[in-house]
Amino acid sequence: MIREERLLKVLRAPHVSEKASAAMEKNNTIVLKVAKDATKAEIKAAVQKLFEVEVEDVNTLLVKGKSKRHGQRVGRRSDWKKAYVTLKEGQNLDFIGGAE
């Protein structure tokens, strides 16, 4: 069993975009920013425990940080991990319910 403090550190924030909204409506999938070292099993356990929903599948990917210029200097944004969490049929999780 994964410790509760680790579960709280795994999930960072919901990722809100057009693609994420379409995935939620079409496939019942939520998109989350997660800790870079998080595993699929940890992400699944964290979502099930914190949001009390049943998870069917978890897909993850690493998003590479973009290079950004600040005048003459070139900086780089940090890499981060994105998780597509598919909920079981009949389950619902609404992050942006009243934001119309």
From Swiss-Prot:
Pfam families according to UniProt: Ribosomal_L23
Q: Which UniProt keywords apply?
A: Ribonucleoprotein, Ribosomal protein, RNA-binding, rRNA-binding
What InterPro entries does this protein's entry cite? Nucleotide-bd_a/b_plait_sf, Ribosomal_uL23-like, Ribosomal_uL23/eL15/eS24_sf, Ribosomal_uL23_CS
The transmembrane residues are: none
What GO molecular functions are on record for this protein? rRNA binding; structural constituent of ribosome
Q: Name one GO cellular component term.
A: ribonucleoprotein complex
| BP terms from Gene Ontology | translation
**Subunit comment for this entry?**
Part of the 50S ribosomal subunit. Contacts protein L29, and trigger factor when it is bound to the ribosome.
The UniProt family comment states:
Belongs to the universal ribosomal protein uL23 family.
Role noted for this protein = One of the early assembly proteins it binds 23S rRNA. One of the proteins that surrounds the polypeptide exit tunnel on the outside of the ribosome. Forms the main docking site for trigger factor binding to the ribosome.
Protein's name in the database: Large ribosomal subunit protein uL23
Q: Species name for this entry?
A: Yersinia enterocolitica
